[in-house]
Amino acid sequence: MAKTVRKARDPLIPGEITTQPGEIELNVGRKTKTLKVANGGDRPIQIGSHFHFYEVNSAMKFDREEAYGMRLNIMAGTAVRFEPGQERTVELVELAGNRIVYGFNQKVMGKLK
């Protein structure tokens, strides 16, 4: 039976992310705003980091026009969960890149205004 031997430190580890020492600041220079948001539904709602906040579940109560073109200002790949009846203040950040939105709840389906 062959035995697998791993060197003390391979030069490449798949999926590894190497960063410089210190803090990493996210979304520097982008427009942000805070909104009070409440889950008016009877089930928990989880919203991911890159979901167009304007288009989240209709049970979420907040000023949708203020959220147009924005997403949660949280790390990529993470989410925020709202329990039924829960209210909290969230920070949103403007969507970047080409600002073209497709899918979600199909309220935009193209270039943001």
From Swiss-Prot:
EC number(s) given by UniProt: 3.5.1.5
GO molecular function: urease activity
Pfam families, alphabetized: Urease_beta
Pathway: Nitrogen metabolism; urea degradation; CO(2) and NH(3) from urea (urease route): step 1/1
Matching CDD domains: Urease_beta
Catalytic activity: urea + 2 H2O + H(+) = hydrogencarbonate + 2 NH4(+)
Record keyword Zinc present: no
GO biological process: urea catabolic process
Listed InterPro entries: Urease_beta-like, Urease_betasu_sf, Urease_subunit
Gene3D superfamilies per UniProt: Urease, beta subunit
Keywords from the UniProt entry: Cytoplasm, Hydrolase
Subunit structure: Heterotrimer of UreA (gamma), UreB (beta) and UreC (alpha) subunits. Three heterotrimers associate to form the active enzyme.
Record-linked NCBIfam families: PRK13203.1, urease_beta
Family: Belongs to the urease beta subunit family.
Designated name of the protein: Urease subunit beta
Organism: Nitrosospira multiformis (strain ATCC 25196 / NCIMB 11849 / C 71)
